[in-house]
């Protein structure tokens, strides 16, 4: 990858990519094993939430995404720069999503970290979707239809959680597909 995020998609991706690059330059990496370097915890926290948020707005997320977050929090909570993480989440309208992911990790998966305040109804709706999401179809046409209709059918994800207008999602999708030679068909 030339960039960390898909910077052709929209301004948010470009700006958040710049935040992640600055974070890498500031904090550096740490060695996992001889010859293997990995970004530090704050970088990974921002990246994991952004990755899950992109899936959440398109087709939804599954338990695996939530388990990844719960395991990450359990292991790296003390290493995260929480002020920087919170600022990034608020600046890019992912704070509600991060709170839902963290609250679900604490309440449903037993992550032993401080749980944020979340509206119970929204957390219940979030978990219902996570636990009942059907697999993505294998055939190209049903796959395309699901990708295109999912955000409209589940507008609450965009409006209430990510605070993004539905039209903006579709605009960014068309623009991103134009720049990426229509990967939506894959």
Report each predicted region and the residues it spans.
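Conserved NTP-donor binding/palm subdomain of two-metal-ion nucleotidyltransferases/polymerases, i.e.
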Residues: 1-186
């Amino acid at each position: 990858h030339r960039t960390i995020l898909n910077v052709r998609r929209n301004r948010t991706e470009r700006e958040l990519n710049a935040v992640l690059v600055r974070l890498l330059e500031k904090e550096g990496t740490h060695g996992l094993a001889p010859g293997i370097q990995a970004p530090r915890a704050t970088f990974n926290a921002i990246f994991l939430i952004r990755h899950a948020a992109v899936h959440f707005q398109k087709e939804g997320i599954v338990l695996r995404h939530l388990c990844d977050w719960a395991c990450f929090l359990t292991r790296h909570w003390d290493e995260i720069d929480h002020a920087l993480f919170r600022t990034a989440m608020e600046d890019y309208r992912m704070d509600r999503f991060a709170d839902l992911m963290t609250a679900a990790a604490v309440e449903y998966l037993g992550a032993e970290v401080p749980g944020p305040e979340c509206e119970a109804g929204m957390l219940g709706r979030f978990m219902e979707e996570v636990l009942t999401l059907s697999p993505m179809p294998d055939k190209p046409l049903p796959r395309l239809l699901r990708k295109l209709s999912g955000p409209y059918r589940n507008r609450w994800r965009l409006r209430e959680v990510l605070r993004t207008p539905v039209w903006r999602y579709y605009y960014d999708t068309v623009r991103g597909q134009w720049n990426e030679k229509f990967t939506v068909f894959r």
